[in-house]
């Protein structure tokens, strides 16, 4: 049994969280979509990630990887040159399209293809202007403070 949530009350009191609500809606509908090819998403360190897709039967030139704004898309399409007669076909060669939503400042650094495994490296690079910084406090120091002589009343 699936449960759906109504986010309408939150829309009235939040500003700028549109993308978050879209991601939650997409996650609720994720159970109905195809999960081919199988994949792993790993955190390698604080700011490094890796997506591994099992694409046995495909070659590197039959796979396209595109990063557009905050969405990473991996598409594969076999180029069948000759018809084969299979007695049993257990390795799928159907076309696929997998999309991954990327967080802010996450960029694709590279991809490699080896032994039927496509690995995509991701790095989160926060701009210097967005990183926390220490602010110095200016003003009078203890050496500049003068005490005024006062008489007790």
UniProtKB/Swiss-Prot annotation:
It comes from the Bacteria. CDD domains: ACD_IbpA-B_like. The keyword Glycoprotein does not apply. Residues 30-140 form the sHSP domain. Pfam families: HSP20 (PF00011). One of its GO terms (cellular component) is cytoplasm. InterPro entries: A-crystallin/Hsp20_dom, ACD_IbpA/B, HSP20-like_chaperone. Coiled coil: none annotated. Keywords: Stress response. PROSITE patterns: SHSP. SUPFAM superfamilies: HSP20-like chaperones. Belongs to the small heat shock protein (HSP20) family. This is Small heat shock protein HspB. It comes from Bradyrhizobium diazoefficiens (strain JCM 10833 / BCRC 13528 / IAM 13628 / NBRC 14792 / USDA 110). The gene is hspB.
């Amino acid at each position: 049994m699936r449960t759906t949530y109504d986010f309408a009350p939150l829309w009235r009191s939040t500003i700028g969280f549109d993308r978050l609500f879209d991601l939650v809606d997409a996650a609720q509908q994720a159970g109905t979509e195809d999960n081919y090819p199988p994949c792993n998403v790993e955190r390698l360190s604080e700011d490094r990630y890796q997506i591994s897709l099992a694409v046995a039967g495909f070659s590197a030139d039959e796979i396209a990887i595109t990063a557009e704004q905050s969405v990473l898309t991996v598409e594969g399409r076999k180029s069948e040159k000759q018809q084969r007669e299979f007695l049993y076909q257990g390795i799928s060669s159907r076309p696929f399209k997998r999309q991954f939503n990327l967080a802010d400042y996450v960029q694709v650094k590279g991809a490699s293809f080896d032994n039927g495994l496509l690995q995509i490296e991701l790095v989160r690079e926060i701009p210097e202007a967005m990183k926390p910084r220490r602010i110095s406090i200016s003003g009078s120091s203890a050496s500049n403070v003068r005490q005024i002589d006062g008489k007790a009343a």
